[in-house]
Amino acid sequence: ILLDRSKLPFEKNAAQVKELTKIAHACGMGVEAELGHVAMGDEGVFTRPDEAKAFVEETGVDALAVAIGTAHGAYKDTPKLQFDLLEQLRDTVPVPLVLHGGSGTGDENLKKACSMGINKLNVAYELYTGAIDGYKAYEASLDEKWRTWAPYDLYDKMQAGIKAVAE
């Protein structure tokens, strides 16, 4: 389960995540939480290693999404990830690290991040774009009998767009 309370102050984030983590663990589920704020655009707040360690110890989460310079959505330019910060986080935090906002970050940045301790990448924006491209191609192929299309046809076309992004 992803618990994102990263917009909240540290104390409130930790308290809510701790309570929800207890419930999730009681049901046999793992928990990923976010500390620092992976924003839309340039408003992000970097994850501090000392806070990250305290957060993990206090909440009992199984994985931690860290903010090292990525953002949700599209980028104007390739982001400059704070690899020195990632190294500190990797050496400080005792659970797997997650990188949100990986779409558009660039293959080299992602490879380096993974080699330095990122265990999971989120790249949804590129996949959404691929799905929309697949939909647009399907829509363009429809004639006046468009009402006869089947939902699974649309799904197949959107999935093809996602696969094209993954390749």
Could you say what each language-model-derived stretch is?
Residues 1-95, 107-116, 123, 135-137, ...:
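Alpha/beta enzyme core
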Residues 99-101:
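Thr-Gly-centered strand-to-loop micro-motif
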